[in-house]
């Protein structure tokens, strides 16, 4: 890159179980909590933010069209600073970092508040065509979340794309379940070691009984066993592989980072977490969208002048165990350096927020281990992949 962009730090909310403790907190309010946490942990003042870019895949609340703008305002960013909501589906959280970095490189801004947010619990049920009225017997209630998870271009649900990868790359059900168990086990180890506590900013949830501070992910199932996973029936096809146990969890959550150019970092005498080295996106066949991280990673490595051997840690979003394993096989990933604290199978996958969470988790772990380079990558519904390489500073 022609101009260095640095990640100063960030925070994420806990990942809340579908229709669980965070179900009444909108994506925007989750985003605002993460944004305020990011500002606090970096000691950057809200009035020092020049632009806000937030990723969001499903617009589920009534005020969702205001997206990043409302996140910025609720985080205390002044009225005269603009905001942008971006949607590259599951890559939105990384795309927000890319878009903010591009603004910094172009000299438009010095700082940017970036991140992602998602409330999957608030995805509404809708009746299409109601404005024009219905004939007798018409008017079908539609689950917008389930409908969104079907790629109508190729008439394949997201889980179906994972089934396709399992067959194409000869990934057995047993392999998928073993990997799902590994995700749960590593997430438990990380949680017990206080790893996630460094990332999380609590969310206050109010009710008639008072308020409670939610400070832990509640989707992980540490009691998971291989025997239990093997008993689960395929969720989408009788002869399929994908089950509730080897797919990512539907959850609510948000994550945010503060990024800045070198001039701002030097002027404020700040100590960044990392430097953004490169990024890339790539298209693949929609029917096997989960393989998207492979070409995206190769492009990001090429742009950085690096090889996979130079990468100390990798975070690959675990949309499905079959999808992760296909990517692992194609890239030749070393599992000892990949998803070392578990992933979306255990923690959950809040679509627009996941990418930012991956980068935040990656940077924290690079600092713990003293590694230099890290790669975060995700597949994207519709047939894309996105990847970002960062360097510990």
Residue ranges and their predicted role:
Residues 1-57, 61-75, 82, 161-173, ...:
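Conserved active-site "lid/cap" helical segment
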Residues 1-28, 37, 141, 225-291, ...:
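Condensing-enzyme catalytic core mediating Claisen C-C bond formation in acyl metabolism
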Residues 2, 105, 111-164:
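Flexible glycine-/small-residue-enriched beta->alpha junction loops
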Residues 11-13, 25-33, 41, 175-267, ...:
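N-terminal extracellular/periplasmic Venus flytrap/periplasmic-binding protein-like
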Residues 47-55, 82-87, 112-117, 175-182, ...:
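Beta-strand segments within the central parallel beta-sheet cores of soluble alpha/beta enzyme folds
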Residues 56-112, 152-158, 223-249, 330-357, ...:
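Conserved catalytic cysteine-centered active-site region
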Residues 87-118, 160, 166-195, 256-263, ...:
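Active-site-proximal alpha-helical scaffold in enzymes
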Residues 160-164, 199, 207, 277-346:
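Active-site pocket-lining segment
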């Amino acid at each position: 890159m022609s101009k260095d962009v640095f990640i100063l730090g960030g925070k994420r909310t806990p990942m809340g179980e579908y229709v669980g403790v965070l179900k009444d907190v909108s994506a925007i309010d989750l985003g605002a909590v993460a944004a305020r946490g990011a500002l606090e942990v970096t000691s950057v003042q809200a009035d020092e933010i020049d632009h806000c870019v937030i990723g969001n895949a499903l617009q589920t609340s009534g005020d969702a069209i205001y997206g990043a703008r409302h996140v910025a305002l609720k985080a205390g960013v002044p009225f005269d600073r603009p905001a942008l909501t971006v949607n590259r589906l599951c890559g939105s959280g990384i795309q927000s970092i890319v878009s903010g970095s591009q603004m910094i490189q172009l000299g438009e801004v010095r700082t940017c508040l970036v991140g992602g947010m998602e409330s999957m619990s608030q995805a509404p049920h809708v009746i299409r065509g109601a404005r024009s009225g219905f004939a007798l017997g018409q008017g079908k209630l539609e689950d917008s979340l389930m409908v969104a998870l079907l790629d109508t271009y190729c008439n394949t649900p997201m889980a179906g794309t994972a089934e396709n990868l399992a067959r194409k790359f000869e990934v057995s059900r047993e392999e998928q379940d073993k990997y799902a168990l590994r995700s749960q086990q590593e997430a438990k180890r990380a949680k017990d070691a206080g790893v996630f506590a460094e990332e999380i900013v609590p969310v206050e949830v109010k009710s008639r009984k008072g308020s409670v501070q939610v400070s832990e992910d509640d989707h992980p199932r540490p009691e998971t066993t291989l025997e239990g996973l093997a008993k689960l029936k395929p969720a989408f096809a009788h002869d399929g592989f994908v089950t509730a146990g080897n797919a990512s969890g539907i959850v609510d959550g948000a994550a945010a980072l503060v990024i800045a150019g070198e001039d701002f970092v030097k002027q404020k005498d700040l100590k960044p977490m990392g430097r953004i080295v490169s990024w890339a996106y790539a298209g693949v066949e929609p029917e096997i969208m989960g393989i998207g991280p492979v070409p995206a990673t190769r492009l990001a490595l090429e742009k950085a002048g690096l090889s996979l051997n130079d990468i100390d840690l990798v975070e690959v979003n675990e949309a499905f165990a079959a999808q992760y394993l296909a990517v692992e096989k194609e890239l030749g990933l070393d599992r000892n350096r990949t998803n070392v604290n578990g992933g979306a199978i255990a923690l959950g996958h809040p679509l627009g927020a996941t990418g930012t969470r991956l980068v935040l988790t990656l940077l924290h772990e690079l600092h713990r281990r003293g590694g230099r380079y890290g790669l975060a990558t995700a597949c994207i519904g519709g047939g894309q992949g996105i990847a970002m390489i960062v360097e510990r500073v």
